[in-house]
Amino acid sequence: MALIDISRSVSPATAVWPGDQEVQWTWTARRNEDESSVNLGSLRLSTHTGTHVDAPLHVKRQGQATDDLPLDSFVGPARVVDVNANAPSVRPEHIGQLDGASAERVLFKTSSGVSPDDEWPDAVVPIQPDTIHALADAGVSLVGTDAPSVDPLDSTDLPAHHALLDTGIVNLEGLVLTNVPPGRYELIALPLKIVGGDAAPVRAVLRDAPDP
């Protein structure tokens, strides 16, 4: 079964939140140079680089860290929802009727996703808190977006982040859904096991959902 890569590429050219740690890649050893028998690389980056999961610790001082997040939230049935290109935010009417297991994880495809990996967007399509509460009522365990944040980029009170925290929904940001049609899929998006982390990079993929 073919996999669809929905992850941002990570390189020194990858755009990051203004003021955040930029991606730094260096070779610490090169084969056949300096008597080394192997190539070794060193990578320095923000926990929020590219496609990543936010842990509750990101917005709550004593919140749950990435290594404590339940792994079953990151694997299983998912639905890609295509939000109107002109929509200023993701509202309850965009989610429609979510059915059964395919509603366990919802990924929003918005106009935010058109920015290339090396360009930070001027604005994003945020998710309204009432949308998040509607998703929680439908039994959703994970919400994903192709935006680098579920809130407006200039937000300081972070209402969507806190709504996700209050409802216990996992927050997956920075997806690449440009060429993914809306519909049912299986999501696999396991975060790095960073002890005490506020967030963690993810390699996220989709594959066609198995027949019900």
UniProtKB/Swiss-Prot annotation:
Binds 2 zinc ions per subunit. Substrate binds at W17. GO terms for molecular function: arylformamidase activity; formamidase activity; zinc ion binding. Zn(2+) 2 binds at D54, H161, E173. The keyword Zinc applies. InterPro entries: KFase/CYL, KFase_sf, Kynurenine_formamidase_bac. Keywords: Hydrolase, Metal-binding, Tryptophan catabolism, Zinc. Its cofactor is Zn(2+). The active site is at H58 (proton donor/acceptor). Zn(2+) 1 binds at H48, H52, D54, E173. Its EC number is 3.5.1.9. Pathway: Amino-acid degradation; L-tryptophan degradation via kynurenine pathway; L-kynurenine from L-tryptophan: step 2/2. It is an enzyme of class 3 (hydrolase). Catalyzes the hydrolysis of N-formyl-L-kynurenine to L-kynurenine, the second step in the kynurenine pathway of tryptophan degradation. Homodimer. This is Kynurenine formamidase. The lineage of its organism: Bacteria, Pseudomonadati, Rhodothermota, Rhodothermia, Rhodothermales.
